[in-house]
Amino acid sequence: MKALTQTTKNANPVSFQAHFQSSNSDEINSLVNTINFEKLKWKLTKSTEATWNEAMCDFAEIEYKKFLTLKMLYPKVSFVPSKLVDKFWHEHILDTKSYAEDCNTLFGAFIHHYPYFGIYGDEDQQSLQASFEETIKLYETHFGSYPTDELFGKQSAEAARCEDHACHVPSSCRCRVPGACK
């Protein structure tokens, strides 16, 4: 099974990893909160390319930071982001310099994105579903209820719209295969 995220170690990961093996979630949350997404959020909400409102973007940033926190707490788990978090992650990756620096700050390594998880047949889809269920379980352990339409209304409903890529939450929609919904 391919993992959704893969890590490429930097030149000196041992001391970094040893430090975070003894860290608690508050310390990790504090480190994640040092990452500045203001430029990314401006692009998404105010630039000529803007497609999000500020409330949606703020919500996405909070959820993405939770995703990063979980990845730090459980580096061997294949987390599956929500569609909204996945979109924010994609935008973060596009700023390659900042993304690489942020990954090094948080993980001591580059976190690769594997956008094909769950599209290669039933077994791969089942692996995606199992990883998503584990993501929800660990999310709820650390942050409370996982965002749903009932809890977060339109923000979550917008986040759950059919997207034309397959690297986020499992879905029975045939759009899991790129181009199928067009």
Residue ranges and their predicted role:
Residues K2-K182:
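Intrinsically disordered, low-complexity, repeat-rich regions
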